[in-house]
From Swiss-Prot:
The organism's taxonomic lineage, starting at the top: Bacteria, Bacillati, Actinomycetota, Actinomycetes, Acidothermales
Subunit structure: Strongly interacts with the proteasome-associated ATPase ARC through a hydrophobic interface; the interacting region of Pup lies in its C-terminal half. There is one Pup binding site per ARC hexamer ring.
GO biological process: modification-dependent protein catabolic process; proteasomal protein catabolic process; protein pupylation
HAMAP family: Pup
The record's note on its domains: The N-terminal unstructured half of Pup provides a signal required to initiate unfolding and degradation by the proteasome but is not needed for pupylation, while the C-terminal helical half of Pup interacts with ARC to target proteins to the proteasome.
Keywords: Coiled coil, Isopeptide bond, Ubl conjugation pathway
Species: Acidothermus cellulolyticus (strain ATCC 43068 / DSM 8971 / 11B)
The protein's name: Prokaryotic ubiquitin-like protein Pup
Length: 71
């Protein structure tokens, strides 16, 4: 099958696609970084909440655990 002469347009399209892929990868990397930072902040908040609960209830928890273990 004879190929149609595109006058070099195919090559330009390929470069454009490669450029678009590079931009897409940069955007994806940025999105991933933002998501990671948000998840890190969420995890830190949860751990802080757990620490607060343990500070308030740790002594009671230990007493009930020891009492149950000693029965």
């Amino acid at each position: 099958m004879p190929e149609k002469d595109t006058g070099g347009q195919h090559r330009a399209t390929r470069r454009t696609e490669e450029h678009d892929e590079t931009i897409d990868e940069a955007t994806a990397t940025s999105d991933v970084q933002e998501r990671r930072e948000k998840l890190d902040a969420d995890v830190d908040a949860i751990l802080d909440e757990i620490d607060d609960v343990l500070e308030e209830n740790a002594e009671e928890f230990v007493r009930s655990y020891i009492q149950k273990g000693g029965e």
